[in-house]
Curated annotation (Swiss-Prot):
GO terms for biological process: adult locomotory behavior; cell surface receptor signaling pathway; proprioception. Residues 1-786, 842-847, 916-940, 1010-1016 are extracellular. GO terms for cellular component: plasma membrane. Belongs to the G-protein coupled receptor 2 family. LN-TM7 subfamily. Residues 247-266, 284-303 have a biased composition (Polar residues). This is Latrophilin Cirl. It is found in: Cell membrane. Residues 1545-1562, 1572-1585 have a biased composition (Acidic residues). Forms a heterodimer, consisting of a large extracellular region non-covalently linked to a seven-transmembrane moiety. Pfam families: 7tm_2 (PF00002), GAIN (PF16489), GPS (PF01825), SUEL_Lectin (PF02140). It comes from Drosophila grimshawi (Hawaiian fruit fly). Residues 808-820, 869-894, 962-988, 1038-1777 are cytoplasmic.
Length: 1777
């Protein structure tokens, strides 16, 4: 085997006693044991195949060694590929195989990377196992592994002494050996063995390795090295010889000592000539021995075969192989058949030589000495067609030794029949087949010519020793011989010895020259000859001479050459007595002798000059201070030298092969086995090469002078590819090795390294050799880790893409804000990081994309971290500025974030590239991270830490500020926004921590994997977990957590047929569809279209209020005046089933136009149709009809819209609706115990009114009320608005000041509770139109007929719903939709009965008593009792379950459908998604009460009230408190009208004091009003600042309310003037409703109302004055904005809204001549007592001025307010008992 960093051998303990006695004792002990040698077998399996190991029954597998990789180029190499790595090893192969096969009879293991990993990508690997079958009984007692052979020396220093004596071999051929010679293994890599073995016999020289005798004694190594490097292997000296035998002992303590007699042959060899780096012990052979007496020291006679890695720096012999030929069935007969073929080498013919013998012959070319070459057995490349995988390889034994042979010859070795078990026939048959795996080979690559010396050099050596010889002549002759003659290994030793001898003799003779100049000239000439000789030895032509030497001799020759040059140079330096610089430059050496005067030294001394040595850019710099300290007599003498090709000689001790010989050796040899007992440190030993030229500097001859200041060296790398880890070293003359003591690496890059040393000598750079087959990061992962990383990255990428698509596709859901832009950028950066990481870990460092991936990944990580910092800063700035109440796209700030994030990141990366591009390209870590140098920490780690610390700091500050604000924040918009910001901060902080943990684990994993640390696996699995969690967190936090996005997901799934049906048929999805025109701004709604089933149609398009579609011209002739040139929405869906899937299956998807053409749709276009907008869902409703949330459950709050005349719809395209929450109604709920709730809401045309309900607990309920205002565009944009865009948070209102129309609808939250009981049929009744109900002859029959029809229709619909819907929630929702359908236009709505019909009063009272409240909280589903009667004129209304719960009461056209519907309670939760298109939380508290946009709109309501409730068709105030025109005029008469001007408070007053009614308003007045309107809108923006309001307090809201009341007065007057009303409140007493009917006045269609009625406006300003009069003693009592819509107690209910104005006026005149009036309660912020909600008796006392024909009416008030949970709260005033 050829295992990296593996050596075989155990410590040998030699005995100094009598060897024969110990041998005899060992023999006796071994005879007691079983003499049967163990059988070792080898099994192979190529990559992708299974390795099967099987033993005989009763035997178990005992694994010795195993490896998954490649150490041989021949195994599993059918095509002869020589480019594969043969230094491939998986360290845990034996561990993995033990877990599968140890102590089993048979096992099978797949040889694949999934099982063992991939140690060398690109190389076809194989699994090799060495094992033996042992009995089961032996396994129970034997725990130690088999011991190596006793002759293996694992920790011995050189076993040869210093000497040169040689013994010539005998002429007869070597005797035939019974077995192959054993191999003594020495650590050729891993340091100095602790013991020395001294050879004891003659030495025969072999090419590349010496055959030497092994001594019988061993000595302790004198001590360890202290050079800072691993000690080199001690090589074998060959100078002292003894004839003692060396008994050896197994280190494992096996029984007996094995003695090697004098005639034992032990094969040893030292790689010679620089080409053989294997350390092989030489063979000791007795020249006169005979085959009969020859014996082996051990049964494991093995071959020691060195090998190298194919790296360019040369390979390293890692192991010494032991082949047990006996176990393989190869005996003496087999060995005799193996010979090395004849060949030519070094001008010699080497004849056929038997394996194990050494061929010795005289040196070539007349040189003195002998040449040697050895024949060994090595594995060969298989022949074509020969399948070597089916054969077993001879197994190497490293355990139990055989007993030594006895003198009698009766030992087991020779008498194999007495000891060896009988060999099976099959085994003998396969012997020849096994032998085919091996072939004899000459080792080493070149013969050993160490003892060969040329005659010329012998002559020069004799001359230099003579006394009168001329040194100059000898030096010249030496240089001539070395340059022109062929030298051998022995010549190299002689040459360096002559150089040293000349320097010693010149030192003695220089005193004989009295003249200084002559002395300098002679020494200079001598030095020139020496330099030329040294250059000749280093020349390439003499490379073969160096290869003739073994590694040790090479080092000794090189050291001798360096010291000889230095000694001769200092001879000249010491001779010079003045400042001088002598330069000797030859081909391979540059020598400079400098003598400097200390006083002239101005700076540091640098060598060499740029023009002196063009071969290299190396430079050495000596500090000035250090030179002066080492001066002598005012002179400093320095010797500099630079060498070329010396680096190929002075190789590190770990690398004994040069590149050429290493590759050749690997191709021709194969390691047959390896020792698996080597420790992990040896296995992980690095391969190092000398990667720079050698440069030297000296201040004293041969002295290692310590300097006070270190010198600086700049050394150029010879090899820049596949090398790493530079180390500054110097050549230690004593150890003949490189040492790092006193030197340090200051900096390095791809081409150069800068070193610093505190002494002077010869310097160079050592570097690690990286395998030429580059490994990507994934090659270091095991199979499981690789799969996990793929899965983790894939999950994270998918979720990031989903989040990005959600932000893009559902952008209508999100309010475009800075936070949205920040998170979009974060997702983009994270996506880039994940993808680049996945690409980078698959690349190799030599890939062209490696540098680009690292650069972009650096930039992406910096940008992503910066965006997290900006997100934390944005949260902080939101809390510390006015942005808390806004959610808009702050474009300048976001642009600044973009600039800082990407700009800074790109700048940092550009600077890093400019400083050191190789950091990203050639020296990075697996194409993912930069090289871990100073630049990495400055440009990568430091910015990330800065951004991270800043993000944490801002998050901490934000949390502190938020805690403070939460204690003082108002329970409105600010509180809601604080809750949102708190949630965002928490989630962002968790996100930041999760991302930081993910990246940190990835970083530590990459670093640990590179260094093969065990903890790297832990970091790897943590990275997988955190990366997966990060992807899930992004999806949950930014997608699933948002309710609006969940709804959009459901809607998206429903609308795409390509998705699976299981998703589209989800019952949790929204069951809705909208049919409407696809009109643009200014378009007209197509109206409400119903099919035969009566389902409500809905539209997906955004339509403005009061718009219609010209696509319905033919089908809707009555809408001709509302046409718009936009086509109808062909994709609109008519819902006829319970869900979209059912609808699709029933083939009921039809467009509006197709339905109209088919005649199955009956379009109903109510006058003043409006579109309620919720996201992309709109519902088209008629005026006076309540609309529920398209997506919420049944029973949502309804909005009532007053109709407008048709001609006004086109004139007012910019109308919008405003929500005015009240502070006091929410802050101070009305106190009291049990109160009865009644609904006095009348819905003309909406299905009747709601009567008095049963007793119920006091409770506030949700309701919405809205205002309307013109969009008078004056060119100046308001805050929060943009051209053509709907602002996210406009100041003071919820409309866009720029767009023609925008509608906002809010829906509360509900939870489902138990349903109501079905009321008796008697309570469910409908009421006819006024014309039929007032006709006494027909009314009874008509009511009975209508009641029966409604009951049948209700039963049919209930059956249909039960079949279609599977959940109570959807059933209730569809019931509500059907209820709206009937009220909206399914058929003509029935009005409430006249108040004088006693029979209906009794029925309503009976139903009220039967129904009771079942829930503490009820929603504001005020439409459920609509169809139960319009009885507000009688002071009665239907309440209870029929009022508040779905399907709870009887119905007519507009009544509740069904009595089993569930009840939905209010959920006080943070429902950010309940507001759409704007969020409820977007109300600015300051601006809602200050800005004129949100307050001036009430003026139109006052105008409408002043004109009379019947002025409009359906002009009653449903659900609110309305005063008659007489009452209003009486109150207005008491007010003083200030002059009309545009002042802060008085700009709305008119200077016209006429009390007469004015039908028209001049154009100048209208223009003046418009200008004043705009000025008010702008001036009121800063009301908070001008009035000095505190930022957050209850007092702040009270003061805002006071300012609001003042604003009401002036805007009310202006609105009257715009609508043609008198400018004061003092109307004549004789003014009545009839006058209003006679003079209809166009207006803006004030939008107020609750529960199916028509609201006309808030009487806040008027009521405030009225209440001040009634409560003169209580000036603090005031009327809040929530006091709305109390029905008057005079006059009957008004006609339906869908009747013509003439019909309504006629019916009103028939019913009552009185106008509608009402009283209202007021709310005080201190006690909130009820002042005007009395019973009908109290009303008569409190309002005696009312007409005596008026019916007693109980008034109720409804109000709405935003609570702290972002929910619109309703407050329904109870009737006093």
């Amino acid at each position: 085997m050829y295992l990296k960093n593996h050596t075989l051998g155990l410590r040998t303990k030699a005995s100094q006693g009598a060897p024969l006695a110990k041998a005899a004792q060992s023999l006796l002990q071994l005879k007691k044991l079983d003499c049967v040698p163990p059988k070792y077998q080898t099994a192979y399996a190529c990559e992708g195949k299974k390795l099967t190991i099987e033993c005989e029954p009763g035997d178990l597998i005992n694994l010795i060694r195993a490896n998954y990789g490649r150490f041989s180029i021949t195994i599993c190499n059918d095509h002869g590929n020589v480019e594969w790595s043969v230094n491939c090893m998986f360290p845990k192969s034996l561990t993995v195989l033990n877990s599968k096969c140890s102590h089993k009879q048979s096992c099978s293991v797949l040889a694949a990377t999934s099982m063992f990993g991939d140690p060398c990508p690109g190389t076809h690997k194989y699994l090799e196992a060495h094992y033996q079958c042992i009995s089961a009984a032996q396994t129970s007692t034997t725990t130690n592994r088999p011991s190596p052979p006793p002759w293996v020396l694992s920790n011995g220093p050189p076993i040869f002494g210093n000497g040169s004596g040689l013994i010539q071999p005998t002429p007869q051929p070597p005797p035939r050996l019974p077995t192959l010679p054993g191999v003594v293994g020495i650590h050729g890599i891993n340091g100095v063995p602790p013991t020395h073995a001294t050879p004891s016999s003659s030495t025969a020289m072999l090419p590349g390795g010496r055959l030497k005798g092994v001594t019988s004694a061993t000595t302790k190594h004198p001590g360890g090295r202290h050079d800072g490097l691993r000690p080199p292997p001690q090589l074998h000296h060959h100078h002292h010889h003894t004839d003692d035998t060396a008994p050896t002992k197994s280190s494992s303590g096996s029984a007996g000592n094995v003695t090697a007699p004098s005639n034992t042959r032990i094969l040893t060899g030292v790689g010679g000539g620089g080409s053989d780096d294997g350390t092989l012990l030489t063979t000791k052979s007795s020249p006169n021995r005979t085959p009969g007496t020859a014996a082996s020291a051990a049964n494991n006679n093995s071959l020691g075969i060195g090998g190298t890695a194919p790296g360019s720096g040369g390979g390293v012999v890692r192991t010494i192989n032991n082949i047990n030929l006996n176990a393989a069935g190869m005996g003496a007969e087999d060995e005799s058949k193996l010979f090395c073929g004849p060949t030519h080498a070094r001008n010699l013919f080497w004849n056929m030589t038997r394996v194990g013998d050494v061929n010795v012959q005289p040196c070539p070319g007349g040189a003195a000495g002998i040449a040697k070459w050895r024949c060994v057995l090595m594995k060969r490349v298989p022949d074509a067609g020969y399948d070597e995988y089916d054969d077993e390889m001879p197994v190497a034994s490293s355990t139990t030794p055989m007993p030594p042979p006895s003198s009698a010859g009766g030992d087991c070795l020779h008498n194999s029949s007495s000891c060896e078990p009988p060999v099976s026939m099959a085994h003998k048959v396969n012997q020849n087949q096994r032998l085919r795996n091996f072939e004899p080979t000459w080792h080493p690559l070149t013969p050993d010519l160490t003892q060969c010396r040329s005659l010329w050099l012998n002559s020069l050596e004799m001359r230099v020793n003579q006394q009168d010889s001329s040194l100059i002549s000898i030096a010249n002759d030496l240089s001539e011989v070395t340059s022109s003659k062929t030298l051998y290994g022995g010549d190299m030793l002689v040459t360096t010895k002559i150089i040293q001898r000349m320097s010693e003799k010149m030192l003695h003779d220089k005193g004989t020259f009295p003249d200084q100049r002559q002395r300098e000239a002679i020494i200079m000439e001598l030095l020139h000859g020496v330099v030329k000789t040294g250059s000749n030895l280093l020349d390439e032509s003499q490379l073969s001479s160096w290869l003739d030497l073994n590694q040790e001799d090479q080092m000794r020759v090189a050291t001798s050459l360096l010291t000889g040059l230095e000694y001769n140079a200092f001879l000249l330096a010491d001779t010079i007595i003045r400042e001088r610089n002598v330069v000797q430059k030859v081909k391979n050496i540059l020598l400079s002798v400098r003598v400097l005067e200390t006083k002239t030294i101005q700076g540091n001394v640098v060598f060499p000059d740029s023009d002196q040595w063009p071969l290299s850019s190396d430079r050495i710099e000596l500090p000035r201070t250090a030179l002066k300290e080492n001066s002598e007599g005012g002179l400093v003498r320095i010797v500099f030298a630079a060498f070329d090709r010396l680096e190929s000689i002075l190789k590190p001790s770990y690398d004994h092969f040069d590149l050429k010989s290493a590759r050749s050796y690997v191709r021709n040899t194969a390691i047959l086995s390896n020792d698996s007992d080597t420790n992990a440190g040896e296995m992980q030993q690095r391969v190092r090469i000398l990667n720079s030229k050698v440069i030297s500097a000296s201040l004293g001859k041969g002295r290692h002078i310590q300097l006070s200041q270190p010198i600086k060296l700049v050394l150029k790398h010879l090899k820049t590819e596949n090398v790493s880890n530079p180390t500054c070293v110097f050549w230690n003359y004593i150890d003949h090795a490189w040492s790092a003591n006193g030197c340090s690496l200051e900096s390095t890059n791809r081409t150069h390294s800068v070193c610093s040393c505190n002494h002077l000598t010869n310097f160079a750079i050592l570097m690690d050799v990286v395998d030429e087959h580059q490994h990507s990061l994934f090659t270091m992962f095991d199979g499981n880790m690789r799969i996990f990383i793929y899965i983790s990255v894939a999950i994270c990428v998918v979720f990031i893409i989903i989040a990005l698509l959600t932000l893009k596709l559902f952008n209508g859901v999100f309010v475009k804000s800075a936070r949205t832009s920040i998170y979009s950028s974060i997702y983009i950066c994270l996506l880039a990081i994940e993808l680049l990481f996945l690409l980078g870990i698959e690349q190799t460092e030599t890939s062209i994309f490696c540098g680009f991936i690292t650069v972009f990944l650096h930039c992406a990580i910096l940008s992503g971290t910066a965006w997290f910092c900006y997100e934390a800063f944005h949260s902080y700035s939101t809390l510390t500025s006015d942005e808390l109440l806004l959610e808009v796209d702050q474009t300048p700030k976001v642009n600044c974030y973009y600039l800082l994030s990407y700009g800074l990141s790109l700048s940092v990366v550009a600077i890093s590239l400019g400083i050191n591009p190789s950091t990203y390209t050639l020296r990075n870590d697996y194409c993912v991270l930069m090289e871990a140098n100073a630049l990495f920490y400055v440009t990568f780690v430091a910015p990330i830490l800065i951004f991270f610390v800043a993000a944490i700091s801002y998050t901490f500050l934000s949390w502190i500020i938020m805690r403070r604000k939460s204690r003082t924040a108002l329970k409105t918009k600010e509180h809601t926004r604080l809750a949102n910001v708190r949630f965002d901060i928490r989630c962002s902080f968790v996100f930041l921590l999760l991302l930081s943990a993910d990246w940190c684990c990835a970083y530590f994993y990459l670093r640990g994997a590179k260094l093969d640390e065990d903890v790297a696996a832990i970091y790897g699995y943590c990275f997988v977990c955190f990366n997966t969690l990060m992807g899930l967190y992004i999806f949950v936090f930014h997608c699933i957590q948002n309710e609006k996005i969940r709804r959009e997901y459901r809607k998206y799934v429903r609308q795409h047929a390509w998705l699976p049906k299981c998703l589209r048929c989800s019952k949790t999805s929204i069951s809705s569809g909208i049919v409407s025109g696809n009109g643009g701004p200014g378009g007209v709604s197509g109206g409400v279209a119903t099919n035969s089933a009566g389902t409500l149609s809905k539209s997906k398009s955004k339509l403005p209020l009061g718009s219609s579609d010209d696509g319905h011209d033919e089908e809707q002739p009555h809408q001709q005046q509302h046409q718009h040139d936009q086509p109808a929405n062909e994709d609109a869906i008519i819902m006829g089933a319970g869900s979209d899937c059912e609808l699709s299956e029933a083939q009921q998807r039809r467009t509006l136009k197709s339905g109209l053409l088919a005649g199955s749709l009956q379009p109903v276009t109510p006058v003043g149709a409006v579109v309620l907008e919720r996201g992309t869902l709109r519902s088209t409703g008629m005026a006076s009809v309540g609309h529920a949330s398209p997506t919420s459950s049944a029973g949502s709050t309804h909005l009532i819209f007053a109709h407008k005349h048709q001609q006004q719809l086109q004139q007012q395209p910019g109308e919008s609706y405003y929500h005015q929450p009240d502070y006091y109604s929410w802050k101070h709920p009305q106190a009291g115990g049990q109160r009865e709730y009644y609904n006095n809401t009348g819905v003309p045309g909406g299905g009747g009114g709601v009567g008095v309900g049963g007793a119920s607990p006091q409770q506030s309920h949700e309701v919405f009320y809205w205002t309307q205002k013109h969009n008078n565009q004056h060119g100046k944009k308001k805050r929060g608005g943009g051209a053509g865009a709907v602002p996210a948070s406009p100041s003071g209102s919820l409309h866009s000041r720029v767009t023609p129309a925008s509608q906002v609808l809010f829906y509360p939250s509900y939870k489902k509770t138990s349903g109501m009981k079905q009321p008796p049929p008697s309570a469910q009744q409908a009421y006819p139109h006024y014309a039929e109900a007032l006709d006494p002859p027909n009314n009874a029959a008509y009511y009975q007929q209508q009641l029966q029809q409604q009951q049948q229709l209700r039963q049919q619909r209930q059956q249909q719903q039960q079949q279609q819907l599977s959940s109570d929630e959807e059933q209730a929702h569809l019931l509500h939709l059907q209820h709206q359908q009937r009220r909206a236009g399914g058929q003509q709505q029935l009005p409430a009965p006249p108040p004088h019909m006693a029979q209906y009063q009794q029925e309503l009272l009976a139903q009220q008593q039967r129904q009771q409240y079942r829930n503490k909280h009820s929603n504001c589903d005020l439409s459920q009792g609509i169809g139960l009667g319009m009885n507000m004129g009688m002071g009665q209304g239907l309440g209870g379950d029929a009022y508040y719960n779905q399907g709870g009461g009887g119905s007519s056209n507009g009544g509740g459908v069904g009595g089993d519907g569930p009840v939905y309670e209010e959920i006080l939760s943070n429902r950010n998604s309940d507001a759409q298109h704007y969020e409820v939380g977007d109300f600015d508290v300051d601006e809602v009460y200050n800005n004129s946009v949100g307050t001036g709109v009430f003026n139109s309501m006052r105008a409408a009230v002043a004109a009379g409730g019947s002025r409009y068709g359906g002009g009653s105030l449903s659900g609110g408190s309305v005063t008659s025109r007489n009452q209003q005029q009486q109150l207005q008469a008491k007010q003083k009208q200030p002059p009309r001007r545009c002042a802060a408070d008085d700009d709305d007053d008119d200077d016209d004091d006429d009390d007469e009614y004015d039908d028209e308003v001049t154009a100048a007045e209208q223009l003046h009003d418009s200008v004043c309107d705009d000025e008010d809108n702008e001036s009121d923006m800063d009301d908070d600042d001008t009035h000095g309001l505190p930022p957050q307090s209850d007092e702040r809201m009270r003061r805002l309310m006071a300012l609001q009341d003042e604003d009401f007065k002036r805007r009310f007057q202006r609105q009257q003037r715009k609508n043609g009303l008198p400018l004061d409140y003092g109307a004549p007493p004789q003014t009545s409703a009839g006058a209003t009917i006679a003079h209809p006045i166009e207006h803006n269609g004030a939008v107020f109302g609750v529960s199916g009625g028509v609201g006309e406006g808030s009487m806040r300003g008027a009521y405030r004055q009225q209440q001040q009069q009634l409560n003169a003693k209580s000036p603090s009592a005031r009327l809040a904005v929530n006091e709305l819509f109390g029905h008057g107690n005079a006059g009957p209910p008004l006609p339906p809204a869908n009747q013509t104005p003439a019909q309504k006026r006629q019916q009103l005149q028939k019913l009552s001549p009185q106008s509608t009036t009402s009283s209202s309660s007021h709310t005080s912020h201190s006690n909130l007592q009820q002042h005007s909600a009395p019973t009908h008796h109290h009303l008569q006392h409190q309002q005696p001025q009312l007409h005596h024909h008026q019916q007693q009416q109980q008034a109720r008030n409804l109000s709405a307010m935003l609570d702290e949970n972002n929910t619109v709260r309703c407050y329904l005033e109870p009737l006093a008992k």
